[in-house]
């Protein structure tokens, strides 16, 4: 639970500094200087000032009020975490929710400064430019971007991480760093650039075939990378590099400089044409004035990273086998443990972590486990805490969304598990979600279709019932990298990135009934070739996740013959691949759980 007195004290200290700096408001985005989704603790300023710990959201504090914007995944969680504080919850994408500039203008009082502050290192160029324009239009407000106000009020603020960097072996990466750099340079030339500033941490880790532990559950390291036609320079705290990594970088023709020297480093590229992605470069770096031209365009690296090498695809398949074994052992244990009455959301999350940790090449969870029992399952990104933890009973649904980081692959799986008797509504909602999941998993489509074109496939059955979910249907998954990866996504909002062979994507429709229960079913899929005809090349999905889907709650009559066939084929594959890795009792349990319906 949020300590409201601590939040109030922090707001008081912040406002004192705001008055000293003649600021009417200060904006705290979720990101760090690298526009990361998951950030090192040093840059968790929004969480520190508001108490809200979701991965997406923006806090704004004026001299008189405070508010927090977040999306539908976090509406319920944010409402609970902000309770008792000054912060008003602003539900994004609802018609009556003001934009951040609109709200700041509404809160402005006579005598207030017209200047709004933000740390320009922690907001993207495109976001700052959009916000500047709207603030000016609404009330002549201006933005100040050169102040990291948290340095003055966050007295025990963590430092930049110093964890050691490790080399990702070629057997898992499948492509040498030097070859990736050459491919990037070729793409830059086609975009009219002779170099680029790479800022996103997973892009840098992928390019250099390096991993680290700077970010919770995400094996990346705080750094910058400048790639030029004849050189590459990694900006990183020197203490993070072992002699082995220093020698490796030299072998790959990558120079090393200190992390804090990035601004001076940029100025050294006079005469170059640097590609800078306005969506991912922070505002401060975008304003560095050096004798170089700028091409403002999307970075080519995310799309390159999204198409996995054959070694990465094989790594996923191996990782999913081990993850599937851990999941089977967990589900078998859960079935026996819940009736004893000693388990809670937190205890089962820890049990699953322990079982995964027994598997070879396990490194960490890929995110904090979402274990929501009954009404907590309706909170899309609920994470149990000691304060919110509740016991599991032999009835109702447990929604379990979890994943692991293995050296050869990243996993992400959701299963909704029937713990005992459930209502007809539980069963009907579960079956609607399953229909959407199976329909997408079995879908074939022209190579190059966008994820937006696929989204309705997972929703159509529930749309017919007047039901829907507000989150995306699928996201990319990194290869021992971030569990959330782009640029491709399957969602209602337009995403134009073409879906091609080698891309991983999740299939995770859900339905959530507030204060009652939630259902989500998720597998990771791989885009693979299907057929080539006179109409072009077609692709399909290969399910990578190997774990039985609970058949107990299914209303079988609601499934079409094709949907039953898809489920039965999936379960046959799960049994065939996992059973050789299990003991006799586990095999028999899995055989029963994967029987045809």
Which positions does each model-derived feature cover?
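Active-site neighborhoods and metal-handling regions in enzymes and metal-associated proteins
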Residues: 1-597
């Amino acid at each position: 639970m949020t300590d409201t007195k601590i939040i109030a004290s922090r707001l008081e200290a912040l406002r004192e500094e705001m008055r000293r700096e003649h600021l009417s408001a200060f904006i705290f985005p979720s990101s760090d200087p690298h526009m990361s989704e998951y950030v090192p603790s040093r840059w968790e300023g929004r969480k520190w000032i508001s108490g809200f710990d979701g991965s997406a959201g923006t806090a704004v504090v004026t001299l008189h009020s405070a508010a927090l914007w977040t999306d539908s995944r976090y509406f319920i969680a944010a409402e609970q975490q902000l309770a008792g504080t000054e912060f008003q919850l602003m539900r994004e994408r609802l018609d009556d929710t003001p934009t951040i500039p609109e709200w700041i203008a509404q809160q402005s009082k006579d005598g207030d400064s017209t200047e709004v502050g933000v740390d320009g290192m922690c907001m993207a160029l495109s976001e700052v430019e959009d916000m500047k324009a709207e603030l000016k239009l609404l009330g002549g407000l201006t933005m100040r971007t050169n102040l990291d106000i948290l340095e003055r009020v966050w007295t025990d603020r963590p430092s930049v991480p110093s964890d050691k960097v490790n080399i990702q072996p070629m057997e898992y990466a499948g492509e040498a760093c030097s070859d990736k750099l050459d491919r990037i340079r070729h793409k830059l030339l086609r975009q009219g650039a002779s170099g680029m500033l790479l800022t996103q941490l997973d892009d840098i880790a992928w390019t250099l075939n390096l991993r680290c532990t700077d970010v919770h559950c995400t094996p990346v390291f705080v750094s910058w990378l400048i790639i030029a036609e004849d050189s590459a320079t990694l900006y990183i705290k020197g203490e993070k590099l072992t002699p082995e990594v220093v020698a490796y970088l030299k072998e790959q023709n990558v120079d090393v400089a200190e992390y804090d020297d990035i601004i001076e480093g940029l100025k050294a590229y006079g005469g170059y044409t640097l590609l800078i992605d306005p969506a991912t470069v922070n505002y401060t770096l975008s304003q560095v004035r050096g004798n170089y031209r700028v091409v403002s365009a999307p970075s080519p690296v995310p799309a390159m990273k999204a198409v996995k090498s054959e070694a990465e695809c094989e790594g996923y398949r191996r990782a999913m086998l081990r993850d599937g074994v851990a999941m089977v052992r967990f589900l078998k244990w859960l079935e026996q443990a819940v009736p004893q009455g000693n388990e809670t959301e937190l205890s089962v999350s820890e049990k699953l972590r322990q079982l995964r940790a027994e598997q070879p090449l396990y490194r960490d969870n890929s995110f904090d486990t979402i274990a929501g029992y009954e009404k907590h399952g309706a909170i899309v990104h609920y994470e149990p805490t000691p304060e919110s933890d509740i016991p599991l009973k032999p009835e109702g649904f447990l929604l379990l969304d979890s994943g692991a980081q293995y050296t050869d692959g990243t996993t992400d799986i959701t299963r909704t598990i029937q713990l005992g008797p459930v209502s007809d509504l539980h069963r009907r909602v579960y079956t609607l979600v399953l229909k959407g999941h199976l329909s997408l998993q079995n879908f074939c489509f022209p190579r190059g279709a966008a994820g937006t074109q696929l989204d309705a496939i997972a929703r159509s059955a529930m749309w017919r019932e007047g039901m829907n979910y507000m989150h995306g249907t699928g996201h990319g998954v990194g290869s021992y990298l971030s569990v959330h990866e782009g640029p491709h996504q399957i969602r209602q909002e337009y995403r134009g990135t073409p879906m091609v062979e080698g891309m991983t994507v999740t299939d995770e429709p859900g339905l959530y009934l507030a204060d009652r229960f939630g259902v989500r079913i998720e597998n990771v899929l791989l885009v693979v070739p299907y057929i080539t005809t006179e109409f072009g090349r077609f692709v399909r999905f290969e399910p990578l996740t190997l774990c039985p889907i609970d058949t107990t709650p299914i209303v079988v009559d609601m499934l079409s013959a094709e949907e039953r066939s898809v489920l039965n084929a999936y379960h046959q594959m799960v049994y065939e691949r996992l059973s050789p890795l299990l003991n006799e009792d586990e095999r028999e349990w899995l055989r029963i759980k994967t029987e045809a319906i």
